[in-house]
Amino acid sequence: MTVNMAYIGIIGGSGLYDLMPESTKKVIETPFGNPSDAVEIGEVNGVEVAFLPRHGKKHTIPPHKVNYRANIWALHELGVERIIGLNAVGSLREDYKPGEIVIPDQYIDFTKRRDLTFYDGPQVYHISEADPFCPEMNSILYDTARNLKIPVHNSGTYITIEGPRFSTRAESKMFRQFADIIGMTLVPEVSLAGELALCYSVIASITDYDVWSTKPVDAREVMNIMKQNDHKVRDILFNALPLIKKERKCSCSLRLDNAKM
């Protein structure tokens, strides 16, 4: 039975815990196993939200081991209809600079061995992913960042690689031909949200130029810039959440219409 606790879910890193000084933990069991951690229900700027740390509270789950199906299902069980994913990404363009924010509008799946669907049979659905992100939330997140004077790009193609390793230089140069940013955690999170007719948008914070640049990607450097970006992401969320209404005027809720075979 669905327990209506929050209509907005946030999936991201542990740096967001201080947004909710008081929260209630919900341990959710799903048909797909355990989520990354307990879901924290709390209030952010007057809005009830459900927060789930994608890699676990202590960041012990690598990107290719995240149980994306359980995470999305758990939020859905709590009554969440809109999800904001928080992602650290590398830049594949010189004009998309470390420290800046991207609100992506397209993605490319370059993962290899993840559970990609809720519908493995006997029910079969083929959802459209022509426009995978919620236009309503994308617009709110972009406008909020602009109003806060945070450097932000309102479009971008996000390529998701399997991880946990970073790209080779040859791979990175290839990816530059058809994507703008690169990361390890968007897919299948975004398409699974679509399979449950949920709204989904991403705040992607650029931590580095990918290895196509002259300097190789360094995990420690990425973490340092991530910490610097945390306050920008928190500011965007704090100001954007009250603008995201429960009533959905987008078409995300219709994603399953005519999708069943």
Swiss-Prot record:
UniProt keywords (A-Z) are: Glycosyltransferase, Purine salvage, Transferase
State if Transcription is listed as a keyword: no
Catalytic reactions on record: S-methyl-5'-thioadenosine + phosphate = 5-(methylsulfanyl)-alpha-D-ribose 1-phosphate + adenine
Q: Pfam families, alphabetically? A: PNP_UDP_1
**Which residues participate in phosphate binding?**
S14, R54, H55, T185
Please name the GO terms of the biological process aspect recorded for this protein, alphabetically.
L-methionine salvage from methylthioadenosine; purine ribonucleoside salvage
The organism's place on the tree of life at top rank: Archaea
Its UniProt pathway annotation is:
Amino-acid biosynthesis; L-methionine biosynthesis via salvage pathway; S-methyl-5-thio-alpha-D-ribose 1-phosphate from S-methyl-5'-thioadenosine (phosphorylase route): step 1/1
GO CC annotation terms, alphabetical: cytosol
The record lists substrate as bound by M184, D208, Y209, D210
E.C. numbers: 2.4.2.28
MF annotations from Gene Ontology = S-methyl-5-thioadenosine phosphorylase activity
The answer to keyword Nucleotide-binding applying to this record is no
For site (Important for substrate specificity), what residue positions does UniProt give? S167, A219
Subunit details for this protein? Answer: Homohexamer. Dimer of a homotrimer.
HAMAP family with a match to the protein in the record: MTAP
Task: Tell me the protein family, please.
Answer: Belongs to the PNP/MTAP phosphorylase family. MTAP subfamily.
What is the role of the protein in this entry?
Answer: Catalyzes the reversible phosphorylation of S-methyl-5'-thioadenosine (MTA) to adenine and 5-methylthioribose-1-phosphate. Involved in the breakdown of MTA, a major by-product of polyamine biosynthesis. Responsible for the first step in the methionine salvage pathway after MTA has been generated from S-adenosylmethionine. Has broad substrate specificity with 6-aminopurine nucleosides as preferred substrates.
Q: What is the protein name stated in its UniProt record?
A: S-methyl-5'-thioadenosine phosphorylase
**Which organism was this protein described from?**
Thermoplasma acidophilum (strain ATCC 25905 / DSM 1728 / JCM 9062 / NBRC 15155 / AMRC-C165)
UniProt lineage? Archaea, Methanobacteriati, Thermoplasmatota, Thermoplasmata, Thermoplasmatales
From the UniProt record, report the name of the gene that encodes this protein: mtnP
